[in-house]
């Protein structure tokens, strides 16, 4: 499902940003 893929990408970006310390 396209929506799920978009949500997954946002979640992944959020996780990466969190690990780097941006968020």
From Swiss-Prot:
Domain of life of the organism encoding this protein: Eukaryota
Keyword Zinc on entry: no
Keyword Secreted attached: yes
Transmembrane segments: none
Tissue expression as described in the entry: Expressed in skin glands.
Keyword tags: Secreted
GO cellular component entries: extracellular region
Localisation per UniProt entry: Secreted
Family, similarity comment: Belongs to the Frog skin active peptide (FSAP) family. Septenin subfamily.
Function: May act as an antimicrobial peptide.
Name of this protein: Septenin 2b
High-level lineage: Eukaryota, Metazoa, Chordata, Craniata, Vertebrata
């Amino acid at each position: 499902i396209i929506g799920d893929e978009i949500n997954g990408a946002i979640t992944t970006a959020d996780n990466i940003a969190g690990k780097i310390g941006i968020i």
